[in-house]
Amino acid sequence: MDREEIKVAVLRMEGTNCEDETVKAFRSLGVEAEAVHIKQFYSDMIRFEEQRSVFDYQCLVFPGGFSAGDYIRAGAIFSARVKSVLRKDIEEFIKMGYPILGICNGFQVLVELGALPGFDEDKPLAEKPEMALAMNDSSRFECRPTLLKKESEKCIFVKNLKKDVVMFPVAHAEGKVVFPSGKEDEYLERLTSNDQIVFRYVDEKGDYAGYPWNPNGSFYNIAGICNATHTVFGLMPHPERAFFGYQVGRREGYGDGYCIFRSVVDYLEKL
């Protein structure tokens, strides 16, 4: 697929944020990207020229924010709206090998959708959530740079990432990765054996450490995971806020987040 043929949809609704940064990151790589309201996929109230299909795109992104005010649970309402009208389309999209990225609130949406941890390759969306992103151990909103160690070689979103440790900022109150009580060891074994743990929080020496390096108390210091096919990726930190050098205090060039977006574009060019 030629780069100019690639189309990316950044899904939005009331309360999401960083859509513009995410769109700009993709566009800077020469692909077509747009922010698309969830209603554009199903509402008859939308003008014909603004109506969209999931299959108009080769990559979907669920951005950060506080969708629907994070009422009930973070990402729950956004997920419910997607599930009610797009479940079959999303499942087919994943089976086709097209990538989906969930950033912060978007990670929460993918968990609520049952897309992550995504152990079953034949059933991309579980019937109910198999993990959760709970309130931070600090019981408050955490907003600052974090250091992340790359753990996966198979996730398509980190194929171009050469550094062992990267810096992405976090901005969340509910980012603690938790698994069902009594199944933590089982889940960890499944994730590690299939190379599904993508990033873990570390300190300035590259060692796994607790708070404040792990900003939320996530199990096993997990910051991001992918599904069994390594094409659906969710993480709490924000790579789009570290895409350009000027976002992270550099005068020129790119930040560490550049490699996330470049990796998925390179993947799509090979399809």
Swiss-Prot record:
Location within or outside the cell: Cytoplasm
Span of domain Glutamine amidotransferase type-1: 7-253
One Pfam family in the UniProt entry: GATase_5
Entry's Gene Ontology cellular component terms: cytoplasm
Positions annotated as active site in the UniProt record: C104, H238, E240
Gene3D superfamilies for the chain: 3.40.50.880
PANTHER family: PHOSPHORIBOSYLFORMYLGLYCINAMIDINE SYNTHASE SUBUNIT PURQ
Subunit structure: Part of the FGAM synthase complex composed of 1 PurL, 1 PurQ and 2 PurS subunits.
Name of protein: Phosphoribosylformylglycinamidine synthase subunit PurQ
Record organism: Archaeoglobus fulgidus (strain ATCC 49558 / DSM 4304 / JCM 9628 / NBRC 100126 / VC-16)
